Every structure is written in C-alpha cells, then in structure tokens.
Regions:
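Internal helix-loop-helix
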Residues: 1-31, 84
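Sensory/regulatory domains in signal-transduction proteins
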Residues: 9, 36, 70-74
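Extended, Lys/Arg-enriched charged tracts that mediate electrostatic binding to polyanionic substrates
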Residues: 26, 38-41, 104-107
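A short, Trp-centered hydrophobic/proline-enriched beta-strand micro-motif
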Residues: 27-37, 90
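A gly/ser-rich beta-alpha-beta helix-loop segment of oxidoreductase catalytic cores
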Residues: 33-52
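Short Gly/Pro-enriched turn/cap motifs at secondary-structure boundaries
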Residues: 42, 78-79, 127-129
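A short core secondary-structure module
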Residues: 57-119
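Flexible, small-/acidic-enriched active-site or ligand-binding loops
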Residues: 116-129
Length: 129
C-alpha cells in the first residue's frame, strides 16, 4: 500500500511539491495509505465515489467530505488506515458547481501520531470485537 498505491499515485500524478514531500515522508518514517473503497461500492470501487472534494477558489483549497451523502459514503477497508500519516484519497471533484469526476488528493491523516481535525477512523470488522 505505502509504496505502490500511495507513493506510486503521488509520483505518477502529483505536482512537484507533493512529489518532493515524499522525501520528507521517507526521512521521518511516515506511512501512507490509499483510500479508494467505499462501503457501498463493493467490486465497483472507483466507479462509485461518494466522497466529495469541493474547490474553494477564494482560498485555493479543496475540502474533502462525505457528510450529507448516503450511509455508505465513507472510505472502508483501507489497509494501514488505522496507522497511516498520509493518505491518497479518491473523491469526486466539484469546481464552481461543475462535477469533474474522481480525482486523487494527498492529505495529512495524522501529525505526531494524532488524527488531524476532521479525520476519523473506525473498526469495520464483523462481528465487532
């Protein structure tokens, strides 16, 4: 996951700053994950993406969320998700009200071992232990 999907995606489609940030990830022993699968997507992962990314032109930032979507619009079965510091997250991008389809976003999940504000994880094992 870390090298092939997380790093591989950043190296393939990331901008210069994102690619250079991978040196820092390696130097500090940080771990990455790849957040594609959503609960209700099943074998159609990547075709069904309910996580949203909204571009804010004023701040030139993206806000990723799955709030207000259906019950199954959260990332699920993300290998290393419980411990990863960085994540490549697939989200359906909207710019100025126009949907642009699924895009990959590099985001911080944790700093100094603590989840970033707005990031949550949960146990998806069944039955729950």
């Amino acid at each position: 996951m870390h090298y092939n999907l997380c790093f591989g995606t950043v190296l393939a489609v990331g901008n210069e700053e994102q690619v250079e940030s991978m040196d820092d990830v390696e130097a500090h022993g940080l771990l990455g994950c790849f957040a594609l699968t959503e609960k209700l997507a099943g074998v159609q992962s990547g075709l069904i993406v309910q996580t949203r990314a909204e571009y804010d032109a004023a701040s030139q930032t993206f806000k990723l969320n799955n709030l207000g979507a259906t019950e199954g619009a959260y990332k699920n079965w993300i290998s290393q998700g419980f411990v990863a510091d960085k994540a490549v997250v697939l989200a359906d991008l909207t710019v100025a009200g126009e949907r642009k389809g699924p895009h990959a976003f590099l985001m911080d999940m944790r700093k100094d071992g603590r989840l970033e504000p707005g990031v949550s994880t949960g146990d998806v094992r069944w039955p729950r232990r």
